[in-house]
Structures are given as C-alpha cells and as structure tokens.
Amino acid sequence: MQVVDWPAWLERHIPYYEKQKQQDRYYDNPPASVLVVDPMDRNRRVGHRGFAWSTWEAMDADIRALHYRAEPVFLDNDTHQRWYWVFWDANEALMAVMRLS
C-alpha cells in the first residue's frame, strides 16, 4: 500500500487516457491524496488481522470502518489490477495505511 499525492497520481500512476476523466470528476473538490493498493498488498497476510483481502468489497468495508472521508476510484482499464481510494485529508490517508497494516 502506498499513499500518493493527487497531482502525482494523475501524472505518473494512471494511464494518460484516464487523467482527464479523473480531473473532470473531481474538478470542484480535488482530493489531497490517493491510497494505491497493489495485488501483493491485498494478498499478504497482515499482522494482527491474520487474513488477506480476497475481495474489493472486504477492503472497502475495512476502509469505510475507519470513518475517514474517502471514496473508491474505478478506472476503465487497469491492467495492473490496482485498487484506489481518494482521500481529502492526506493525514487520514497515511493513518489508513497504518491502521490497515
């Protein structure tokens, strides 16, 4: 899992054809950062949790349980099968990584 600031994510972490769509989606209220979850991250057994996230719904439920202002981002074509959540508070994104690890 990693947290990437919003502008860097738009420039370097998503395909170029997704950039404009995501900029338009959050035009009025851009998020501060993005939580990027790779397949390796979600399939790893995690310390006190003792289990992996086998489905997107399971991980989304864990993120929602933190009660931070976050929402998932779905890309039209993500060949790397990464999962993304945007956060409007960068500190909450970092706390989410710590609490989910």
PLM feature spans:
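Short, compact, well-ordered microdomains
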Residues: 71-101
